[in-house]
């Protein structure tokens, strides 16, 4: 049998997932239970869209809970003190010059379980994150992206 996938995460990422899991188990489950009770009060379940919706919401939430529990159970937390100061790694904040847009951008390199590109948290498994990991200040990387090749120069590296 194969080993379960391990999720490299920062301490901050673990705390965020734990908070989301707690919310789903306490608040969201109660809300759904209440919706189901109300829907059952409407009688005939064969054409009760409120009941169907609540049951679908329940199934989605329970699936999300299992997913979060699995990620947390298989999390490998990056020790902040072991994050190198001069090499990009998970837990680093890296400032790069994006040559496509001629601008400076700061990314946090995180594990795939906590990636959020809209917040500039990119996974070490993403094309850009993977290209940056292991590099130093002054290095220039070229990354194959869906619309061609992007070029980045590493300007600064900090611990997350």
Curated annotation (Swiss-Prot):
PROSITE patterns: GREAB_1, GREAB_2. It comes from the Bacteria. Residues 49-75 form a coiled coil. Keywords: Coiled coil, DNA-binding, Transcription, Transcription regulation. It holds the Pfam family GreA_GreB_N. The keyword Ligase does not apply. InterPro entries: GreA/GreB_C_sf, TF_GreA/GreB_CS, Tscrpt_elong_fac_GreA, Tscrpt_elong_fac_GreA/B, Tscrpt_elong_fac_GreA/B_C, Tscrpt_elong_fac_GreA/B_fam, Tscrpt_elong_fac_GreA/B_N, Tscrpt_elong_fac_GreA/B_N_sf. GO terms for biological process: DNA-templated transcription elongation; regulation of DNA-templated transcription elongation. SUPFAM superfamilies: FKBP-like, GreA transcript cleavage protein, N-terminal domain. GO terms for molecular function: DNA binding; RNA polymerase binding. NCBIfam families: greA, PRK00226.1-4. Belongs to the GreA/GreB family. HAMAP family: GreA_GreB. Necessary for efficient RNA polymerase transcription elongation past template-encoded arresting sites. The arresting sites in DNA have the property of trapping a certain fraction of elongating RNA polymerases that pass through, resulting in locked ternary complexes. Cleavage of the nascent transcript by cleavage factors such as GreA or GreB allows the resumption of elongation from the new 3'terminus. GreA releases sequences of 2 to 3 nucleotides. This is Transcription elongation factor GreA. The gene is greA.
